[in-house]
Amino acid sequence: MKVVTPKPFTFKGGDKAVLLLHGFTGNTADVRMLGRYLNERGYTCHAPQYEGHGVPPEELVHTGPEDWWKNVMDGYEYLKSEGYESIAACGLSLGGVFSLKLGYTVPIKGIVPMCAPMHIKSEEVMYQGVLSYARNYKKFEGKSPEQIEEEMKEFEKTPMNTLKALQDLIADVRNNVDMIYSPTFVVQARHDHMINTESANIIYNEVETDDKQLKWYEESGHVITLDKERDLVHQDVYEFLEKLDW
């Protein structure tokens, strides 16, 4: 069975550019609808895909936050090289953490962290997430249940150094959130079981900018960009971007 894997995308629009960042074990499909929505309203949108994502899970464990941050910065530099001077960043989960890191690393017009963790529930929760991703990917490849079980046994023997590195990244970003002066719109799903939702309050309270807002989405889970309130999220993100001083 030919597996069609998501790829980076660029939707060319006007002079205002938005870098869209997906989550850990996710891919650009997580932010594609948001990208289309913003592009239809005049924005240029670019979404990099992190190394080791959208490929067999065996490849994921050989990459880490440093690789993914490089992919994010390459995405930012790509927009710059295409002539976009004004760039906002909008990210889901780990992508939201990266959007905050961009906020104190390079000039950013506005930041939208969506369901972004400021501390991880536990390494075990993350590990279960990786196993679930691996199992689903193998199903997606059309493998038999027996083959999947066999491959999963092997996969579970692989050291997951990535998870510790991810925790370190999140801790580092949390320590620097008070260096963010760009307007920030914190998006958080009420029924988010992947992260500690207190993270949203931490981000909102600690960013240094006065131009900030926090909105809770009462009907949504962690992948808020694909959940039942996604249309509202699209609209709210667009309205936030429209108010920025481009």
From Swiss-Prot:
Induction: Constitutively expressed, part of a 5 gene operon with multiple promoters. Not ethanol-stress induced. It catalyses: a carboxylic ester + H2O = an alcohol + a carboxylate + H(+). The active site is at 93 (nucleophile), 192 (charge relay system), 222 (charge relay system). InterPro entries: AB_hydrolase_fold, Esterase_lipase, Hydrolase_4, MAG_DAG_Lipase. Disruption phenotype: No visible phenotype. One of its GO terms (cellular component) is membrane. Involved in the detoxification of xenobiotics. Shows maximal activity with C6 substrates, with gradually decreasing activity from C8 to C12 substrates. No activity for higher chain length substrates acids rather than long-chain ones. This is Carboxylesterase. It comes from Bacillus subtilis (strain 168).
